[in-house]
Design a protein with these regions (language model features):
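Helix-terminus loop motifs that line ligand-binding clefts
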Residues: 90, 104-154, 300-308
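C-terminal beta-rich recognition modules with glycine/proline-rich loops and embedded aromatic residues
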Residues: 289, 355-363, 368-460, 494, ...
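Aromatic (Trp/Tyr) and acidic
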Residues: 20-103, 107, 142-179, 216-234, ...
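Beta-strand-rich ligand-recognition modules
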Residues: 488-508, 514-528, 680-706, 714-790
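Asp-box/WD-like beta-propeller blade repeats and closely related beta-sheet repeat scaffolds
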Residues: 140-160, 186-210
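Extended extracellular/luminal ectodomain segments enriched in beta-structured repeat modules
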Residues: 462-466, 703-712
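Solenoidal tandem-repeat scaffolds enriched in leucines and small polar residues
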Residues: 193, 200, 206, 210-217, ...
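Bacterial Sec-dependent N-terminal signal peptides
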Residues: 1-21
Length: 790
């Protein structure tokens, strides 16, 4: 960036007040909550340092290009098919940090808004058919939107999630107004919303539903916010049109339809559902969002608050993927789940929302920032002894870099909320609150999570109000203590609630809260053999080594977000043995002088010497998060299972006449592969080959002169949303037609055997085995091919 615009031009467009508490009735402006020394303030400050290393002109380059203007700097190359998306996130991050006092972030925010105004003006001139109000950097904007407006979605569906991309700038402009009161950003935002209304006005409801089949971020949310700002019903109507019925209808009817859905496509939709419910009173939207939150946090989230694997919600049968896969929960999901949690708490305050917010903030969001260079994390694997990798400034412009830019500036947003005459203390965070409407200032002193107490002091003002202190769900019944000015308060509620103290407050009044933390275990959803160890709400992990941390700092490659070092064998990871699994938590012993560090004394197979510590402290290392935990009897059965598997493997080898590993160069060369537009990949460290729509691949295989043979194929058990239909031929003679569509619903390898007629083998030392996809169908990945004796 060449310079910042801080002239009278921008000063005239900026008003000192913000709109945060006007748009979100229970929130305090971010600038009225000051973080004091602690892990969250440290992360916030480091994030500002990281953010200021990015180049605004490079982030703005896609917007100038699509507006027909010469970019002032070269655009970032990574994820270029989604060009422009990080620019919107960055604008939000600048607004958030400007609101909490960063003058340089404010200058950058104002510069970006000035440049975006230039782009918006150019779009009117250069794209008169569709460009009025447009402020997007989506590659190929002219081809996408000129055809989209006519109801032709071919270019739209052939592009990488156009509305998802645009939503980031909708949100960025809104946030510059919400957090900083920037009127120019407000006008750009409302104009952009008018553009969306005009663009879709000619589409039928059926066309809208079809279009929403492409990932579109939280378009319904930002349009609902435009309604909240302007009170013009057209924005609320459009927000409802942007609400995907495929998700809204089953969720509102309490039907869980999430299996195999792309997780971060769904969460922003639901944030919009709840915003519409709040502003319109439509119970169907609220029912959808509460049910979604309940099943995601209650049944589909891991111990640190994250959800999804391979970016999708697994079925119950496929939850072992969390142990096997390296692409665990995605950081973006949790960013959006926290937004939803804030909205639900505003609609109906409930301590369970604050419990989840705390869990996800300290265990996931905080952990996704590298504590030294400030890089961001995409995936957090739960696979035993794997690791995470990090972005670097000005490289790796992933979606989770964008949300990461925002995350660490918002730590003060939910510490306190208010509703009528009530002040909610949702989180134990060292901070100061300026409740301007009441003339009250409150200071909270705590070292949480490294301490089990918090002290709140009224430092200015007086008045009658109810102070509601959270009784965390992780504190045992009867153990929370609250004192006002040194005198104990009678507590009539239990864990997972708020303790209300309604009185006349004055300067100098104190509230002391004690919240004893205990050790516990959390079971992996639907895989109860695996447990995580917790201390209070804090997930404990263990460092296990630093070997082969490939791509620890990600490069600019398309798939650089994967921690692609060696996957260490799961069966060689530590196993906890105890006849009382719950009692494992009682065998954690604190390490003297090291807060939240523990040793574990339970019997351990494949033991690794080390200490358990907060997961958010673990970086640049392989780690244990979930542990296989077995009783003595179950462990014996586990060993017997391994022995049986080895016996079966040896028996299979004895029956095998020939075998091919699809997707691997040498075996396919050895078997003289022939193919027409097939393709390969790797899942769970096993290569595969596949073909679709009449295309094929084949191998020349040895028969050993045998005529009593079958073909044994290896499949992966999840893939029921695809149409898997194909023919198997031997020497161009059909042996069988296979339909595997919806056949398996479990994340493990499956094997099928197909007998070959003897007359196709008689007198032959080799045969060509061919796999041909049915027209319009897909074979489905084949992971292994064997000729075996019957």
């Amino acid at each position: 960036m060449k310079k910042f615009v801080t002239t009278v031009l921008m000063a005239a467009a900026f008003v000192a007040a913000n709109a945060q508490d006007k748009l979100y009735a229970d929130e305090f402006p971010l600038g009225d909550v000051t973080l004091n020394d602690g892990v969250l303030k440290k992360a916030r400050d480091l994030n500002i340092h990281t953010l200021l290393q990015y180049d605004c002109d490079r982030l703005l380059a896609p917007y100038r290009k699509e507006a027909g203007l010469e970019p002032k700097a070269k655009a970032y190359p990574n994820w270029d098919g989604l060009d422009g998306h990080v620019g919107g996130h960055y604008l939000t991050a600048m607004a958030i940090n400007a609101a909490t006092g960063s003058e340089e972030c404010r200058q950058r925010m104002e510069y970006m808004i000035s440049e975006l105004q230039t782009c918006a003006d150019a779009n009117v001139r250069n794209h008169p058919e569709w460009g009025r109000g447009y402020v997007g950097g989506m590659p190929g904007s002219d081809r996408i939107w000129s055809t989209f407006k006519k109801g032709d979605f071919r270019v739209y569906f052939g592009s990488w999630a156009p509305f998802y991309n645009l939503h980031k700038m909708f949100a960025g402009l809104r946030d510059a107004y919400v957090y900083c009161g920037n009127e120019q950003a407000k006008q750009l935002f409302i104009g952009f919303c008018d553009w969306a209304i005009d663009l879709t006005s000619g589409l039928s409801d059926q066309q809208m539903e079809q279009m929403l089949g492409n990932e579109h971020g939280g378009m319904n949310e930002v349009l609902a916010d435009a309604y909240a700002i302007t009170h013009e019903k057209k924005y609320l109507d459009c927000a409802k049109r942007f609400s995907h019925r495929r998700l809204l209808t089953p969720m509102s009817q309490r039907i869980d339809c999430l299996d195999n859905m792309h997780a971060n496509t769904q969460v922003p939709k639901v944030v919009g559902f709840e915003r519409i419910a709040e502003l319109s009173g439509d119970e169907a939207y609220h029912n959808a969002s509460t049910f979604f939150w309940d099943i995601v946090t209650g049944e589909r989230s891991l111990a640190f608050g994250g959800d999804s694997r391979r970016e999708h919600f697994p079925s119950r049968e496929a939850c072992t993927d969390f142990i096997n896969d390296i692409d665990g929960p995605e950081s973006c999901n949790t960013n959006n789940m926290l937004k939803l949690t804030e909205d639900l708490h505003r609609y109906a305050p409930d301590a369970r929302y604050a419990d989840f917010y705390e869990l996800a903030t300290f265990n996931h969001i905080l952990s996704t920032q590298h504590p030294e260079h400030g890089g961001y994390v995409y995936f957090t694997p739960a696979r035993p002894r794997h690791y995470r990798n990090y972005s670097a400034p000005n490289e790796a412009m992933w979606c989770c870099v964008g949300t990461g830019m925002e995350n660490h500036g918002k730590y003060g947003q939910f510490v306190y909320t208010h509703r009528g005459n009530a002040l909610y203390v949702n989180l134990f965070v060292a901070s100061e609150l300026n409740w301007r409407d009441r003339g009250i200032r409150l200071r909270q002193e705590t070292a949480f999570p490294y301490a089990e107490t918090s002290k709140m002091t009224i430092t200015e003002g007086k008045g009658q109000f109810a102070l509601l202190v959270r009784y965390p769900g992780w504190v045992k019944a009867g153990e929370l203590t609250v004192k006002v000015n040194g005198q104990p308060v009678d507590i009539y509620t239990g864990p997972g609630s708020y303790v209300a103290i309604d009185r006349k407050w004055k300067k100098g009044d104190t509230v002391e809260v004690g919240f004893p933390m205990h050790n516990s275990i959390k079971y992996l959803p639907n895989v109860p053999q695996y447990v995580a160890l917790m201390h209070g709400p804090i997930l404990l992990g263990m460092k296990t080594g630093t070997e082969d941390l490939a791509h620890l700092i990600a490069d600019d490659s398309r798939f650089g977000q994967y921690a692609s070092g060696k996957k260490l064998p799961v069966n060689e990871a530590p196993i906890l043995i105890n006849d009382n699994i719950e009692a494992i938590a009682d065998q954690l012993s604190p390490v003297a002088g090291k807060p939240l560090h523990f040793t574990l004394s339970t019997r351990t197979v494949n033991e690794i010497k080390g200490e358990l510590q907060p997961f958010f402290e673990i970086h640049d290392s392989r780690y244990m998060m979930y542990w296989l935990a077995l009783s003595e009897h179950s462990y014996e059965a586990y060993l017997a299972q391994l022995a049986k598997a080895e016996e079966e493997r040896q028996a299979l080898e004895a029956r095998t006449i020939d075998k091919v590993q699809p997707g691997e160069q040498q075996p396919e060369t050895d078997h003289k592969m022939e193919t027409d537009r097939s393709f390969t990949g790797n899942t769970n460290d096993v290569f595969w080959r596949d073909a679709r729509d009449g295309n094929y691949f084949s191998y020349l295989m040895q028969t050993g002169g045998q005529t009593d043979l079958s073909l044994r194929l290896k499949y992966w058990g999840v893939g029921e949303w695809k149409s898997h239909e194909f023919d198997i031929l031997v020497d161009d003679v059909l042996v069988t037609s296979v339909n595997n569509t919806g056949k398996y619903r479990i994340s493990e390898f499956k094997y099928e055997t197909y007998e070959i007629p003897a007359d196709l083998l008689k007198g032959k030392s080799q045969v060509r085995v061919k796999f041909v996809a049915k027209p319009g169908k897909q074979i489905g990945e084949i992971y292994g091919v064997r000729l075996i004796k019957n």
